[in-house]
Amino acid sequence: MKELLNRLISHETISTDEAKQVIFNISEGKYNDTQIAAFLTVYMMRSITIEELEGFRDALLELCIKVDLSAYNAVDLCGTGGDGKDTFNVSTTSSFVTAGAGVKVAKHGNYGVSSVSGSSNVMEYLGIKFSSDAGFLEKCIDQANICILHAPLFHPAMKNVGPVRKSLAVKTFFNMLGPMVNPAFPKNQLVGVFSLELARMYAYLYQNTDKNYTILHSLDGYDEISLTGETKSISNNSERILKASDFGVSELKQTEIAGGGSVESSAEILTNILKGKGSQAQNNVVCANAGMAIATSRNMSPHEGFAEAKESLESGKAFDSFKKLQKLSQN
């Protein structure tokens, strides 16, 4: 590790194979917490290369506990987090709206590191069971159209990193990796990233896979469609700038999509929206993101996807998916 750190501090880069080996070494407990923290810190101070990101991704996918949900042709809605915006849990809320529209969802998530409340914090608070049992996950996706894949259960090799990330409490390259390492290997993916540079890296790596994908970055910094400004969208066949008008709605103010200051208030926002008690701004931003997931899965326009998402939310189907998942979690 000493030699590696010296190279990285001297602005050298490492190869894909070397990046893979670092993750393998971390998983085998070869580095102490201080060394891991130093390694993560280097990548907060310099850009990651595509080769390095690819190596880290490949190692995590090789080491993860895999679950085969390929029969469901599911989509994952997952953001990198780390955008510093402290919105409510847009991707998680949008996942239930997507499920309510009849699109199967394999939602990858984790506890918050740089935010008050990550996807898993809210799901856990609301009584959603975390399991790596394939039978349980299939039952969830069959009956509720959605299953929750809590990252630590599927990436045990990374147990040594969790406490370090928590104590650092800022985004690290593991934020960049989260959406790439879903253990169900979903064929459809809506991924939000915290920078334009990372959006381009994702596009480069995804174009060499069989994924059907849409990568999003709001130009004012959000790792999702915020409707507070324009959003860069990169998919298999196109690059475009999305505006609020593409979904038939008006632009929002940033304060209108602010998150709760605690897990409890974040959970309340999510359930209120699904119950039909959300503000128009909250409903629109959720339907825009769910709409893009639906559009990605069903090969339709953002406007058409938005209409399906809105119907899912307003008809109560989104809340039904949530209630079914809650009920399955109690058995």
From Swiss-Prot:
It is an enzyme of class 2 (transferase). It catalyses: N-(5-phospho-beta-D-ribosyl)anthranilate + diphosphate = 5-phospho-alpha-D-ribose 1-diphosphate + anthranilate. Transmembrane segments: none annotated. Pfam families: Glycos_trans_3N, Glycos_transf_3. Anthranilate 2 binds at residue 165. One of its GO terms (biological process) is L-tryptophan biosynthetic process. Its cofactor is Mg(2+). InterPro entries: Anthranilate_Pribosyl_Tfrase (IPR005940), Glycosyl_Trfase_fam3 (IPR000312), Glycosyl_Trfase_fam3_N_dom (IPR017459), Glycosyl_Trfase_fam3_N_dom_sf (IPR036320), Nuc_phospho_transferase (IPR035902). Pathway: Amino-acid biosynthesis; L-tryptophan biosynthesis; L-tryptophan from chorismate: step 2/5. Anthranilate 1 binds at residues 79, 110. Mg(2+) 2 binds at residues 223-224. GO terms for cellular component: cytosol. Its EC number is 2.4.2.18. Disulfide bonds: none annotated. Mg(2+) 1 binds at residues 91, 224. 5-phospho-alpha-D-ribose 1-diphosphate binds at residues 79, 82-83, 87, 89-92, 107-115, 119. One of its GO terms (molecular function) is anthranilate phosphoribosyltransferase activity. Keywords: Amino-acid biosynthesis, Aromatic amino acid biosynthesis, Glycosyltransferase, Magnesium, Metal-binding, Transferase, Tryptophan biosynthesis. Binds 2 magnesium ions per monomer. Homodimer. Catalyzes the transfer of the phosphoribosyl group of 5-phosphorylribose-1-pyrophosphate (PRPP) to anthranilate to yield N-(5'-phosphoribosyl)-anthranilate (PRA). NCBIfam families: trpD. Belongs to the anthranilate phosphoribosyltransferase family. PANTHER family: ANTHRANILATE PHOSPHORIBOSYLTRANSFERASE. This is Anthranilate phosphoribosyltransferase. The gene is trpD.
